[in-house]
From Swiss-Prot:
It comes from Legionella pneumophila (strain Paris). This is Outer-membrane lipoprotein carrier protein. Participates in the translocation of lipoproteins from the inner membrane to the outer membrane. Only forms a complex with a lipoprotein if the residue after the N-terminal Cys is not an aspartate (The Asp acts as a targeting signal to indicate that the lipoprotein should stay in the inner membrane). Keywords: Chaperone, Periplasm, Protein transport, Signal, Transport. It comes from the Bacteria. GO terms for biological process: lipoprotein localization to outer membrane; lipoprotein transport. Belongs to the LolA family. GO terms for cellular component: outer membrane-bounded periplasmic space. Its main location: periplasm. It is found in: Periplasm. Monomer. HAMAP family: LolA (MF_00240). The keyword Chaperone applies.
Amino acid sequence: MNKLFLILLLIFSHEVFSQTSAEVLQSKLNAIQTMTANFSQIVKAKNHEVSRSSGSMALQRPGRFRWQTKDPLEQLIVADGQKMWIYDVDLEQVTVKNQEKGLGGTAALFLSGYDETLTHDFDVSEKQKGKLTVFDLKSKSAKENFQRIKLIFSQSALIGLELYDQLGQITDVKLVQIKSNPKLPAKLFQFKPPKGVDVVKQ
C-alpha cells in the first residue's frame, strides 16, 4: 500500500524524459495534472497471494497526494508537497515525515528537481497489448527498491500498475472510476491528526 503511494507520487513528480518511449510516457503523464480513482490492489510472492486491499486515491501535481485504504484495514496517507502523514486508524497512530525523506532514493531526487533521474535509473520501453499501451520501466541498478514498473494506459487514462520489488513481490493495481483533471479542493491534501491519536515524527 505504502509502496504504491510512493511510486505514484514518484511518477507524477518529475518533468523530463529523453528517450522516445519515455517521451511518449511523459506526454501522457504531463496531461494528467489532477486525478481521482478507486483502486484494488493484490500483492503476490512466489505466485501466492499475500494481501488484497481496496480504496480511493486523488493526486494533484506536483507532489500532492491522498491514498485512502478502506478494506481490509483503514489507512490514510496524505502528502502536501512538504510533509507526509500516514494515519493507521486501527492503531490510532499518525506517522509524520518530511515528504522527501518519506519517499527516499529516486523519488526524492525527482521532487528535488533532478529531472533526468528517471532515464538515469530506468530503461523505458513500450508495447501495445490489444487496445492498451504498456510502458515497461526496468531499473539499471540492483539497489533500486523497484526493479521493474509497468504502467498500463487505455488511451490517455492510467488504468493499472505492476510493481516488482527487490524481494520478488509483485504488486498488481487496478484503477477504476477514473477522473482526469477534475477540480480538487485543497483540503484533500491537508491533514490534521484526530484528537487522542499518537503522533510519531520521523
